[in-house]
């Protein structure tokens, strides 16, 4: 007879305790513990839908044909996955409510239906509701199946009947296994349902997409084990009041985690943005103070983005600092360098900084653009609309080299920029395209003197 053991599990982080706790000692969440009964039982060996048991094989004998990636019609989506969908992969997609996760997967699944059988399982919407949303996306292939169900046993039965090539679960928090105690979305339910989906995906080469809810802190809800079990973790980011969405990989066993895909939400669904640099800069005002352009790298893709700054005298006892899309600590460091090394009196100035377009900038190469934007607003002097800035700022005010400098300069030249300020030590041996001047600089003070003299 199976032994039953009661444990209390934190719904936020998955921490387990033998007794109820008002506050989680791991994540400090209040009233997050729920009681769950753990049933220990011996399960049979895992088999595929064809009834074949898995057995050890030599690495050199593994068939590489099964690794063939399936391309979707969205090049941005393929880029983030590393070149396409790998058979048997388990892909988790998280994002804020209403950001467009279901819309993205519905578009992707309709495209995959042209290359295989798709089973779309929804625990949040009825089949009629999904059909209503899908009508704006265009024609749907006959190999696209909808299934509104939350019972894992029933879902497994239909998987065995249909034998899909692609499976979409929307969402994992709504699916429950009747063999496991706990409500839908509980730690034990999410863990066991994900384990069963992983077994189905790996033994039958079913590419599986899972939608995951996020907490108010922006992390994926449920046990941390969920992210360890899957092959790929994607975050769909963006502000609900902006039309742009960014798909970012934070874990990918079949590709790079540095790639991003950029989409725009329109009435007909998500449309990929193939030239994000032009989109992010098209509304920039000529002659405005507090603005500077940087060429940032998102994976292997260079993107031109605008850094905006507003520096005003404070009316409070302490100066206020606010950032959106930029790292607060990095901005504070740059302001300290400007005050110490360049003589800008910023201790009594409020500073508000943001990256235009909602894109997040977090690499060291943006330092020089941030410094120039702050100085431009402080001095009330605009920068030239044809100038871009590259470089990391050290604590002594020096400009340090950044990666892929040649690729960044080429992107700036392609969009019509005529001058780029870049670290002098990084310019040796690179080919500079015609029509653009690259100014090698060594200190941030040298840049400010050249730009605002």
UniProtKB/Swiss-Prot annotation:
ATP binds at residues 95-102. A motif (RadA KNRFG motif) lies at residues 251-255. One of its GO terms (biological process) is recombinational repair. The keyword ATP-binding applies. Keywords: ATP-binding, DNA damage, DNA repair, DNA-binding, Hydrolase, Metal-binding, Nucleotide-binding, Stress response, Zinc, Zinc-finger. SMART domains: AAA. A zinc finger (C4-type) spans 10-27. Its EC number is 3.6.4.-. One of its GO terms (cellular component) is cytosol. One of its GO terms (molecular function) is zinc ion binding. Pfam families: AAA_25, ChlI, Zn_ribbon_LapB. InterPro entries: AAA+_ATPase, DNA_repair_RadA, P-loop_NTPase, RecA_ATP-bd, Ribosomal_Su5_D2-typ_SF, Ribsml_uS5_D2-typ_fold_subgr, Rubredoxin_2. Residues 350-453 are annotated as: Lon-protease-like. DNA-dependent ATPase involved in processing of recombination intermediates, plays a role in repairing DNA breaks. Stimulates the branch migration of RecA-mediated strand transfer reactions, allowing the 3' invading strand to extend heteroduplex DNA faster. Binds ssDNA in the presence of ADP but not other nucleotides, has ATPase activity that is stimulated by ssDNA and various branched DNA structures, but inhibited by SSB. Does not have RecA's homology-searching function. Has a putative N-terminal zinc-finger, a middle region with homology to RecA with ATPase motifs including the RadA KNRFG motif, while the C-terminus is homologous to Lon protease. Belongs to the RecA family. RadA subfamily. This is DNA repair protein RadA. It comes from Streptococcus pyogenes serotype M1. The gene is radA.
């Amino acid at each position: 007879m199976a032994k039953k053991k009661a444990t209390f599990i934190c719904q936020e982080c998955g921490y387990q305790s033998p007794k109820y706790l008002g506050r989680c000692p791991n994540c400090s969440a209040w009233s997050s513990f729920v009681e769950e009964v753990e049933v220990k039982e011996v399960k049979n060996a895992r088999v595929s839908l064809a009834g074949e048991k898995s057995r050890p094989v030599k690495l050199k004998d593994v068939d590489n044909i099964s690794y063939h990636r399936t391309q979707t019609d969205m090049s941005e989506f393929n880029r983030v996955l590393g070149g396409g969908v790998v058979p048997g992969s388990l892909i988790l997609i998280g994002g804020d409510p209403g950001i467009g996760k279901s819309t993205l997967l519905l578009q992707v699944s309709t495209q995959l239906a042209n290359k295989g059988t798709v089973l779309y399982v929804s625990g949040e919407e009825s089949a009629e509701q999904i059909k209503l949303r899908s009508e704006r996306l265009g024609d749907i292939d006959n190999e696209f199946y909808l299934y509104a169900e939350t019972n894992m046993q029933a879902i497994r039965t239909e998987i065995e009947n249909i034998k899909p090539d692609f499976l979409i679960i929307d969402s994992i928090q709504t699916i429950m296994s009747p063999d496991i105690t706990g409500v839908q979305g509980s730690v034990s339910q999410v863990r066991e349902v994900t384990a069963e989906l992983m077994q189905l995906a790996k033994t039958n080469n079913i590419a599986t997409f899972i939608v995951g809810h996020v907490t108010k802190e922006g992390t994926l809800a449920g046990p941390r084990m969920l992210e360890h079990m899957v092959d790929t973790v994607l975050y769909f980011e963006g502000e609900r009041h902006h039309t742009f969405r960014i798909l970012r990989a934070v874990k990918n066993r079949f590709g790079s985690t540095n790639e991003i895909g950029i989409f725009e939400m329109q009435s007909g669904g998500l449309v990929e943005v193939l030239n994000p640099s032009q989109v992010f800069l098209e509304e920039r005002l000529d002659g405005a103070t507090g603005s500077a352009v940087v060429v940032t790298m998102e994976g292997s893709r260079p993107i031109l983005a605008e850094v905006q700054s507003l520096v005003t005298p404070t009316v409070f006892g302490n100066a206020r600092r606010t950032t959106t899309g930029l790292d607060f600590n990095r901005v504070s460091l740059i302001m300290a360098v400007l005050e110490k090394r360049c003589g800008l009196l910023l201790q009594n100035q409020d500073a508000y900084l943001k990256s235009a377009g909602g894109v997040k900038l977090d690499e060291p190469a943006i330092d020089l653009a941030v410094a120039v934007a702050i100085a431009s607003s402080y001095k009330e002097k605009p920068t030239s609309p044809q100038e871009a800035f590259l470089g990391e700022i050290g604590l002594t005010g020096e400009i340090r080299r950044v990666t892929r400098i040649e690729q960044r300069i080429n992107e700036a030249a392609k969009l019509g920029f005529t001058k780029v300020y870049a670290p002098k030590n990084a310019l040796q041996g690179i080919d500079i395209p015609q029509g653009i001047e690259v100014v090698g600089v060594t200190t941030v003070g040298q840049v400010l003197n050249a730009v605002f003299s």
